[in-house]
């Protein structure tokens, strides 16, 4: 494993000393020593996941502090755990380097050089990690960048062999291999050695060595999601197959503990080698003692998994294996309280005394009988984190405040699920404009084929009442473009027929629950199991209605193009992003084989240039809304949740059938939508 070093500066000496002191150097391998049966050691296995480079508690889009997220608060919990537990380990389950303005700034704007360490890794090194794995979003910036910032030479086309500055803890990844030689691009597993305090049955304390094996996995669908970065360079295997391949090697080293770090969640559907969330099956691989999860942006233990087979949602076990998933954006710390006991000359887990927890940085308080997140109840940020990254953070903020124009319209996603397309219209307009120019030269045979565009609102409240796009009338900056288009996707266009277009929209309409008009009570409009970023809305002359009284797959009606019914054989070019075009979201007919344009430019950059070309943006520059709900008279009320006190926003965009019913007291409210209008 890489040697852990503490590079101190005068500014952050105390911080780094505190971080490194809490995690000892790995001891040199020693001859096996006899330890008495009955010896006990309690170890806290701590986990962060899906930090997405949210280091500081700051909302880049609203330009204000947000104490409900940020690694600087998680650090406070890590220090608390290390104070509470004599023995601890700290791991990260991936999606670490991408997902914030700061991350994009260091990767794409003021790209760090080989000798610089990425800001998120600087802070993680300062606190002291024992290991981690690679998430799917680590691949978004390409393999050369990933190789550089992780200090991992890869035998992959287009990637240099130079070793650059990277994290001081081992990164392991077992299921991504180089096409050149078939070997893993990261170490698939490694052994770390630590000395822990243990206690004999009579209460005497001993210092005992433990060998801990860690093995890492990423979601196999990365080959679809980042096809342009990975195709022809790497291959991916299923998480179970990779574990089965390397477990014999690991067991040959006789580790005391095997920890699987999966950037993935859990799914009990029949296993396939390309399963995105294979944690339930990974827990069944013999030899894995502990399972660390991620990717799903939720908590385990947590109510989402309460009905899952062979899952203990109270104590945090998956098929008998202690497991944890620690949220996202630094909102939580995963904690497994692992009770080890020495029996028959080996360490075993005392499952009766082992359990998992998720520690939130903002413990909920009860408001009106409902648990509510209150900023006043959040743990304080560790003040030293700001000292480590404050300079580059300010540079990123200054950059995204670069002016690019003016707008006379409000563009928001508060009611994007209900028909407000104001935040999607500029994205779709920019996509159509770019694609038409490129296709005219690259594919003149498509000159008469209509070009339309698809976009989804990326921020629709999943992360809380502030997790919405809201670009107010007035000056536009690069921050506005980042707010309108959150992810670093590239523009891609596909050629499909009318039947494929309808199937695309039918898949999108799974965002809604089926509404029974005869039910007299409240019915929820939104299907929360279907991600908002998969609710694609198509503009550019296409119009349609969505009948939510119909079953999924039969909801799209009156599908037309420029007033004429779309036939199944009619041809279209749909402009979207690389994620969707390559199969992301499992849309029918989208698997990367019908791509007619794979642009080198990022959608966000295309949008920013389009906004600059329209220095005073108005409604005349934007495509009109393309869909609405089919009229449906219901006996009861159809409801949904959004940010509170936004009814005037809906009305300003022409949605006069929406009214706020009740305030939840946590920044959100329940709204009613009258589908009969």
Q: Regions from the language model: what does each represent?
A:
Residues 1-10:
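Bacterial N-terminal signal peptides that target proteins for export
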Residues 17-19:
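C-terminal motif of bacterial Sec signal peptides marking the signal peptidase cleavage site
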Residues 21-357, 429-430, 434, 586, ...:
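Acidic, metal/ion-coordinating pockets
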Residues 32, 36-44, 54, 62-69, ...:
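Feature captures C-terminal
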Residues 218, 351-368, 560-563:
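Short, solvent-exposed aromatic-acidic interface loops
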Residues 236-242, 357-378, 595-610:
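Short, cationic low-complexity segments
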Residues 378-381, 497:
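Mature, solvent-exposed C-terminal subdomains and processed small-chain segments of exported/organellar
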Residues 399-420:
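Glycine-rich phosphate/diphosphate-binding loops and the adjacent beta-loop-alpha structural elements
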């Amino acid at each position: 494993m890489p040697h852990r070093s503490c590079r101190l500066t005068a500014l952050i000496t105390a911080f780094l000393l505190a971080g490194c002191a809490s995690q000892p150097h790995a001891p040199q391998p020693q001859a096996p020593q006899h330890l008495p049966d009955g010896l006990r050691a309690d170890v806290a296995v701590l986990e962060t996941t899906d930090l997405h480079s949210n280091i500081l508690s700051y909302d880049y889009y609203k330009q204000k502090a947000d104490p409900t997220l940020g690694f600087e608060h998680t650090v406070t919990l890590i220090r608390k755990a290390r104070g509470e537990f004599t023995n601890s380990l700290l791991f990260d389950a991936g999606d670490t380097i991408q997902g914030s303005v700061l991350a994009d700034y260091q990767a794409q704007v003021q790209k760090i050089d080989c000798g610089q360490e990425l800001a998120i890794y600087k802070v993680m090194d300062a606190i002291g990690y024992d290991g981690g794995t690679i998430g799917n979003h680590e691949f978004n910036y390409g393999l050369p960048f990933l190789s550089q910032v992780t200090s991992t030479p890869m035998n992959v086309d287009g990637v240099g062999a130079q070793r650059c500055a990277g994290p001081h803890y081992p990164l392991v990844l077992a299921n991504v291999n180089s096409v050149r030689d078939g070997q893993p691009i990261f170490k698939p597993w490694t052994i770390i050695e630590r000395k822990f305090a243990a206690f004999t049955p009579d209460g005497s304390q001993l210092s005992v060595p433990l060998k801990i094996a860690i093995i890492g996995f990423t979601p196999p669908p990365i080959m679809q999601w980042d096809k342009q970065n990975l195709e022809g360079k790497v291959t991916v295997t299923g998480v179970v197959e990779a574990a089965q391949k390397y477990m014999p090697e690991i067991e040959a080293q006789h580790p005391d503990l095997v920890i699987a770090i999966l950037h993935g969640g859990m799914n009990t559907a029949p296993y396939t080698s390309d399963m995105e969330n294979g944690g339930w099956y990974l827990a069944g691989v013999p030899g894995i003692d502990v399972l660390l999860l991620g990717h799903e942006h939720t908590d385990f233990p947590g109510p989402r998994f309460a009905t899952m087979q062979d899952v203990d949602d109270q104590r945090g076990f998956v098929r008998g294996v202690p497991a944890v998933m620690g949220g996202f954006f630094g909102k939580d710390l995963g904690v497994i309280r692992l009770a080890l006991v020495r029996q028959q000359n080996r360490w075993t887990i005392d499952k009766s005394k082992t359990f998992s927890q998720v520690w939130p940085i903002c413990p909920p308080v009860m408001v009106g009988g409902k648990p509510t997140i209150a900023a006043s109840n959040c743990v304080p940020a560790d003040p030293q984190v700001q000292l480590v990254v404050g300079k580059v953070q300010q540079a990123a903020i200054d950059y995204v405040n670069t002016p690019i124009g003016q707008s006379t319209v409000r563009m928001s996603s508060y009611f994007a699920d209900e028909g407000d397309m104001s935040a999607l219209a500029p994205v779709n307009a920019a996509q159509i404009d770019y694609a038409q120019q490129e296709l005219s030269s690259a594919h003149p045979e498509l000159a008469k084929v209509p070009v339309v565009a698809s976009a989804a609102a990326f921020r629709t409240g999943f992360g809380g009442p502030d997790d919405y796009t809201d670009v107010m009338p007035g000056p536009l900056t690069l921050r506005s473009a980042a707010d309108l288009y959150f992810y670093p996707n590239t523009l891609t266009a596909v050629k499909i027929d009318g039947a494929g277009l309808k199937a695309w929209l039918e898949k999108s309409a799974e965002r809604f629950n089926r509404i029974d008009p005869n039910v007299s009570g409240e019915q929820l409009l939104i299907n929360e199991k279907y991600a908002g970023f998969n609710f694609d809305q198509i503009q550019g002359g296409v119009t349609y209605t969505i009948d939510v009284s119909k079953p999924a797959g039969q909801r799209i009606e009156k599908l037309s193009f420029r007033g004429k019914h779309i036939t199944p054989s009619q041809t279209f070019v749909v402009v979207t992003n690389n994620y969707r075009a390559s199969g992301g979201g499992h849309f029918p007919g989208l698997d990367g084989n019908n791509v007619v344009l794979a642009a080198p430019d990022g959608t966000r950059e295309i949008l920013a240039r389009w906004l600059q070309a329209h220095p005073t943006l108005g409604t005349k520059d934007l495509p009109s809304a393309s869909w609405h709900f089919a009229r449906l008279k219901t006996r009861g009320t159809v409801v949904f949740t959004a940010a509170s006190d936004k009814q005037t926003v809906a009305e300003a965009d022409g949605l006069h059938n929406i009214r706020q019913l009740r305030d939840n007291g946590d920044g959100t409210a329940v709204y009613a939508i009258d589908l009969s209008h």
